[in-house]
């Protein structure tokens, strides 16, 4: 891990001043497109990337800054945020790519696909990528092989990927005659984009997204138990899109017994997505076949899928995560209830939090979080706004808000209200890349 990553800067929301924005690269993934999210608030929810004119000459630092900005177009989850930029041997911009989520092309492959579609000859070209290319075959092929086969002569990367299943990309490229440069001055910026993903990978557990929806004063149900609905349709649709991008969605036995949810993922029209997450229940009370989460008695027109259900008979988060990781789950969504959120937050196991809040006040009812034993303020887990991913940190969804949060960096004593600032990198004064 880079030293003091929380004190480092990211390329921020802007390109270096020497680049002149001209066109926009929309977030156009089939599953997470701006169009799919746009209806929620009447505005595009995903970021757009300001691109320089094709053919504009970029310095090494400008090209890597652009790769970092492209990475921010991606979606958090099973894979890290990564961006890639291709220039010709003289630095003229050719193509930009980024990774849109698990199962979609990696950033390098995305940029190479754009080059193939345009008929661009990449012989002797340079590639700048925010993370060392992977060297393994998973849901997609090894990027290091694709880069070498495309004719790229020089590759620049910001941060080494030494995770178990991806390491070795730079070494492979060198073995194929590609000149590889490590741009260490950008390493912390790349790490900061994916800090919690690297932690999850090192701990050999899924990346965890927790979701909660509450009133302004923090209740998820009234005193009599009624809760449908606190948030409006836009927020609920957004929650289903998070389910859709996760490998598994998990609730506790109490929520299962009280609410009897289906835990399926549906689109804005209420139709089930073809890809459905594994439905997981954590707890020691056996969930019988009559509960909808088991998938044995689906609604009319929906096929039964009991094989897509798993109950883990434990109250130990680590035991649950070990079981899911062994089954190939790399992105887990915690849907509820409040005890689950508190339990995982207390163990510092939440990597991303999406909190929906409705303009409603109850004064009493069921709290959004419990089982979090905080006796004094210093013990409370600290979160901070997530400005680095695909979405703005706070979005308006109809009459509700969605706040995107990540834990404060480990090992920091963050005061209330303190936040990592993200100024621009000064491309004019960054050192030249090191050749290794």
Where are these regions (language model features)?
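Enzymes that bind and transform nitrogen-containing heteroaromatic metabolites
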Residues: 2-19, 24-79, 95, 139, ...
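Proteins enriched for Cys/Gly/acidic motifs involved in redox and nucleic-acid/cofactor modification
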Residues: 76, 103, 170, 179, ...
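N-terminal glycine-rich anion-binding loops that anchor highly charged ligand groups
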Residues: 76-91
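Residue-level recognition of the N-termini of beta-strands and the immediately preceding loop/turn
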Residues: 82, 123-126, 277
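Short, compositionally biased "basic patch" segments
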Residues: 85, 107-111, 115, 211-213, ...
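Active-site beta-strand termini and strand-to-loop segments that position acidic
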Residues: 88, 202-203, 407-408
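Zn2+-dependent cytidine deaminase-like catalytic core
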Residues: 88-189, 324, 343-345
């Amino acid at each position: 891990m880079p030293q003091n990553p929380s004190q480092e800067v990211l390329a921020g929301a802007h390109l270096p001043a020497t680049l002149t924005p001209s066109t926009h690269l929309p977030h156009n993934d089939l599953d997470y497109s701006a169009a799919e999210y746009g209806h929620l608030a009447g505005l595009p929810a995903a970021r757009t990337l300001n691109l320089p004119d094709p053919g504009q000459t970029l310095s090494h630092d400008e090209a890597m800054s652009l790769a970092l900005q492209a990475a921010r177009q991606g979606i958090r989850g099973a894979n890290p945020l990564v961006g890639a930029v291709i220039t010709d041997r003289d630095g003229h911009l050719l193509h930009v790519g980024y990774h849109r989520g698990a199962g979609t092309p990696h950033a390098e492959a995305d940029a190479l696909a754009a080059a193939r579609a345009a008929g661009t000859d990449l012989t002797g070209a340079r590639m700048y990528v925010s993370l060392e290319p992977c060297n393994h075959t998973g849901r997609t092929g090894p990027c290091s092989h694709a880069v070498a086969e495309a004719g790229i002569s020089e590759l620049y990367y910001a941060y080494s990927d030494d995770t178990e299943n991806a390491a070795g990309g730079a070494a492979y490229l060198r073995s194929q005659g590609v000149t590889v440069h490590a741009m260490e001055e950008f390493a912390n910026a790349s790490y900061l984009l994916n800090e919690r993903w690297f932690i999850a990978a090192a701990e050999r557990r899924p990346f965890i997204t927790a979701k909660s929806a509450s009133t302004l004063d923090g209740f998820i149900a009234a005193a009599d138990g009624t809760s449908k609905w606190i948030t409006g349709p836009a927020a609920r649709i957004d929650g289903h899109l998070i389910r859709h991008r996760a490998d598994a969605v998990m609730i506790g036995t109490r929520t299962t017994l009280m609410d009897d949810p289906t835990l399926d993922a549906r689109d804005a029209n209420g139709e089930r997505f073809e890809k459905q997450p594994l439905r997981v229940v954590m707890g020691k009370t056996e969930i019988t076949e009559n509960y909808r989460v088991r998938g044995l008695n689906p609604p009319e027109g929906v096929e039964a899928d009991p094989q897509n259900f798993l109950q883990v008979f434990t109250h130990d988060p680590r035991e649950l995560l070990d079981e899911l990781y062994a089954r190939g789950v790399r992105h887990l969504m915690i849907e509820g209830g409040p005890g689950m959120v508190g339990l995982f937050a207390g163990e510092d196991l939440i990597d991303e939090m999406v909190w929906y809040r409705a303009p409603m006040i109850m004064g009493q009812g069921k709290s959004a979080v419990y089982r979090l034993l905080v006796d004094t303020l210093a013990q409370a887990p600290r979160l901070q706004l997530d400005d680095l991913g695909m979405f703005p940190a706070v979005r308006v969804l109809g009459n509700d808000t969605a706040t995107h949060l990540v834990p404060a960096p480990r090992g920091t004593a963050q005061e209330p209200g303190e936040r990592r600032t993200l100024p621009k990198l000064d491309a004019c004064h960054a050192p030249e890349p090191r050749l290794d």
